[in-house]
């Protein structure tokens, strides 16, 4: 077969147009296949890169309540989960929207209060830029780590001198038209000398990391939390531990891994990959039909040789 293929590939043909069409068809199939492989490889690499960004900020497992915003972390079922041997780091967090003001600039932000062991839970140190260290508070003031896009919107810079004012509505308090400011809590955050950059707009443009005590004081909570974030011991199977925790907590709580915490982002990426795959497969199919047509013309051209 190789001898026959080489003979007809390099031999002189009667119809030069057939040779040109055949060459174009073969090149079309090769280029379409190359484009399909390269595109899918790029999407897979891009997905891994995005997952790496979230890995540095999101926990391995996260517990949230299915209905409502907050829950009591001292419930019996929560304590039972906390006692699991597979859990290495356990952190309580509280997230809520607030308005922040620096001088004459204002912006809406998400205040995320975390415990001091948050840097053990995630690779937050690798996301910090500036001269400061990861310090949430001291005996005098509370510190706030702002996202890189949020500091640009507020104009604070990495090391801001004036305190950042944070406003949040008081719970179960009606607004007094004569004095509307009385319906809001106001607290102050100071610069720790560092900011964070996750390279994801969701976090960089809205989030402020601070202490859990500050968040509870601002939003009028005592011991409630909005989530419990966990890091497992090395060698633990995340899927099996996730199922075990979900079985203990029941339907009232949601247990998510890193991919489920960012389900919308990865779903969009999968849709983009599918669309690209279908589009390039369609082009490859057209190129294959061209090859079939070229082979048909080549068979007609070589009918005399076949008969002999």
Language-model features: locations:
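Short amphipathic alpha-helices in soluble, non-transmembrane regions
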Residues: 75-82, 125, 241-249
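A short beta-strand structural signal in non-transmembrane regions
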Residues: 61-65, 224-242
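Membrane-interface junction motifs in transport/secretion proteins
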Residues: 47-77
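A structural signal for hydrophobic secondary-structure junctions
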Residues: 79-209, 213-219
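Peri-transmembrane interface segments
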Residues: 13-23, 234, 238-292, 298-301
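Conserved phosphate/oxyanion-binding catalytic-loop motifs
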Residues: 306
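N-terminal Sec/SRP start-transfer signal
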Residues: 1-33
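Alpha-helical transmembrane segments
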Residues: 9, 20-21, 31-59, 296
């Amino acid at each position: 077969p190789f001898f026959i293929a080489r003979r007809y590939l390099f031999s002189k043909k009667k119809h030069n147009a057939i040779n040109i069409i055949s060459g174009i068809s073969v090149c079309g199939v090769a280029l379409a296949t190359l484009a399909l492989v390269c595109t899918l490889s790029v999407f897979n690499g891009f997905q891994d890169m995005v997952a790496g960004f979230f890995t540095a900020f999101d926990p391995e497992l996260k517990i949230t309540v299915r209905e409502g915003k907050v829950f009591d972390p001292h419930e019996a079922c929560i304590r039972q989960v906390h006692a699991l041997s597979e859990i290495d780091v356990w952190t309580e967090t509280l997230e809520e929207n607030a308005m922040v003001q620096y001088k004459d600039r204002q912006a809406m932000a998400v205040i995320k209060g975390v415990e001091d062991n948050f840097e053990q839970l995630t690779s937050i140190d690798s996301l910090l830029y500036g001269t400061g260290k990861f310090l949430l508070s001291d005996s005098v003031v509370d510190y706030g780590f702002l996202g890189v896009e949020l500091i640009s919107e507020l104009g604070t810079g990495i090391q801001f001198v004036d305190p950042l004012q944070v406003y949040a509505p008081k719970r179960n308090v009606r607004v007094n038209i004569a004095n509307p400011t009385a319906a809001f809590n106001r607290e102050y955050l100071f610069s720790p000398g560092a900011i964070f950059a996750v390279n994801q707009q969701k976090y960089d443009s809205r989030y402020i990391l601070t202490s859990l005590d500050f968040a509870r004081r601002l939003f009028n909570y005592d011991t409630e939390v909005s989530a419990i974030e966990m890091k497992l011991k090395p060698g633990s199977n995340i899927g099996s531990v996730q199922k075990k925790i979900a079985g203990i907590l029941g339907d009232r709580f949601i247990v998510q891994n890193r991919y489920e915490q960012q389900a919308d982002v990865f779903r969009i990426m999968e849709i983009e990959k599918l669309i690209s795959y279908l589009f390039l497969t369609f082009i490859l199919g057209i190129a294959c039909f061209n090859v079939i047509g070229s082979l048909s013309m080549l068979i007609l051209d070589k009918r005399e040789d076949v008969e002999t």
